[in-house]
Amino acid sequence: KKYYSMRKILLITLAAMTIYACNNNGSGVKKGSREAGSIFYKEYDTPFGAPPFDEISEEDYRPAFAKGIEEQNKEIDSITNNPEAPTFENTIVALDFSGSILDRVSNVFFGLEGAEKTDTIEKISIDITPVLSEHSDNIYLNSKLFDRIKTLHDDTTGLNLTTEQYRLLDKYYKNFVRSGIMLNDAEKQRLREINKELSSLT
């Protein structure tokens, strides 16, 4: 998941979101009565699971990004520190389901950034993009995590994977390789520096 380049705000449910935004009756939690960012901390309780745009303010994004990164780091640590041998469920599925908070806030923020960029949104984008780039590097250059993926990818005998499951495993394996996991430590550090520089230019 390359969050800092995300621009795909729920295209499949765009019509549903539009209807909801237009017809919402104002019920639900108001912006001032909850912790900033908490709107993104769980699944949306809205028709079609659409983001409740009328309840989201610019003050929600920074804490939600911070919380999302923190929670995904915990989820990744749980995978890499699992004493059990890697399985499709405890490694690939767990990885695929990680970062739900970050997914929600990224989808909304980067989608709205392109549609209605305010000075505040622009400042948040400038600040958060390098942070998300570093977070992505921390995942895709995580040797312990890749070792578990590689173990599964190198020998799928006995895994009894469906075609869809194998494609997901193969996708993650290739994403890690393309992101530089095979580089030596010095090369990885240089890659991090390049990615940081590039993220500061976007």
Language model segments and positions:
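Bacterial Sec-dependent N-terminal signal peptides
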Residues: 1-33
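Zn2+-dependent metallopeptidase catalytic domains
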Residues: 22-202
